[in-house]
């Protein structure tokens, strides 16, 4: 919560927007759960933000799903559910960090260049190989191809598969 204290020093004409996606945090994939919070010292700016948000957010993203919001509401109003959620979140976060750490160690060991990784579900690897997706599929590796990079979903990997995966990617990069 301390981070929000920085917003107290904003100029009167500034609108800061804080966004949050609950879909991944709460493992509610596909539920479109999240928030967009406008912060300003000006009531007029906040009123405009609310009015524009009502139309633009609904036009782009539909509306927040009621079941998803109900689940989150139950988690945070029940101390037992909240603690269980926090315990599970810690386990998941620790596992994701361990997978990322191992991938990064293996990438360094095999001189596999990656884009800076600061956390999250994906690690991105630059490539000049225009056939990288096809080459990796032939080696039974499935990644997300993008322009000049591939994204590896480390959230879906078993720890013991990571060293071999890095070697296969390095072979085709």
Language model regions located:
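Short beta-strand
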Residues: 19, 113-118, 143-146
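Conserved core segment of the aminotransferase class I/II
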Residues: 9-93
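Soluble or luminal CAZymes and related metallo-dependent hydrolases
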Residues: 64, 95, 99, 161
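Short, solvent-exposed loop/turn segments at secondary-structure junctions
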Residues: 23-25, 41, 121, 148-150, ...
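Conserved PLP phosphate-binding loop immediately N-terminal to the Schiff-base lysine helix
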Residues: 1-5, 16
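Conserved PLP-binding catalytic core of the aspartate aminotransferase-like
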Residues: 85-137, 156
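PLP-dependent enzyme catalytic core of the Aspartate aminotransferase-like
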Residues: 12, 130-173
């Amino acid at each position: 919560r301390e981070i929000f204290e920085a917003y107290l020093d904003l100029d009167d004409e500034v609108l800061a927007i804080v966004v949050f996606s609950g879909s991944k945090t709460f493992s509610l994939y596909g539920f479109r759960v999240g928030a967009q919070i406008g912060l300003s010292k000006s009531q007029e700016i906040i009123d405009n933000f609310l009015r524009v948000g009502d139309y633009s957010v609904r036009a782009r993203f539909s509306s927040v799903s009621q079941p998803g919001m109900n689940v989150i509401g139950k988690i945070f109003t029940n101390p037992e559910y909240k603690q269980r959620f926090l315990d599970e979140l810690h386990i998941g976060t620790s596992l994701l960090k361990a997978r990322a750490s191992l991938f990064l160690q293996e990438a360094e060991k095999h001189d596999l260049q990656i884009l800076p990784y600061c956390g999250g579900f994906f690690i991105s690897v630059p490539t000049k190989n225009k056939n990288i997706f096809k080459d990796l599929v032939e080696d039974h590796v499935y990644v997300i191809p993008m322009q000049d990079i591939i994204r590896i979903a480390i959230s879906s990997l078993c720890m013991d598969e990571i060293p071999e995966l890095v070697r296969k990617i390095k072979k085709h990069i």
